[in-house]
Amino acid sequence: MLKKSLLSKECRETSLAGVHHVVMRGFNYERVFNDEQDRRKFLEILRQITHPMDENGTPLPPYCTIYAYCLMTNHIHILLAEGTEQMSDTVERISEAYINYYDNRYERQNPLFTERLHSRIVDNVGYFLIALRYIHQNPVKAGIVKSPSLFQWSSFREYDGSIDTDCICSHTLPFAHMGKKDVCELVVSVSKKRKHKKRTQRTRSKLL
């Protein structure tokens, strides 16, 4: 069972600094990923952002810390904390790197992402938990999979142990008392509640 201390009022209102929920949307809601290669390239860029190195292969301080991500077909969710640069500069860095790859591969020049950056400041633990849960539940809500663990292109697989090498996310969350197992329980509990609600609705409809 998820620790009650995580959901207490005091914990939910704990202030966080420099954390943002970023959504990178495709221009005119068009797709930004066409196949597995595109998605793997984007994840490679995220690794370079969170684990940068100089020309000699010496590790550098991260541009940002990523706590969650989800690669949908026409948009991307990222939950991040600012590192050596501001959030907008980091997102621009990610965007430019992926656009260069995408344009070269498909020989195109049209806009790929919307010019306006969609982001919300995550200023307390309560909203952090909501964002963490929402991002990992995105493929389930979209009807792509029945469980977050079945979606290949989100950070949930890092938290549940399906991926244990070349991880992008920091699993040390910006507050105490919550580990990877707690994150999985928090996210999956929503799926269970949704399934229960659907079963209840179907039962009621049969009775009417």
Locate each region found by the language model.
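Short Pro-Cys-Gly-centered "Cys-loop" motif that presents a nucleophilic cysteine in a tight turn
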Residues: 1-68, 72-73, 81-208
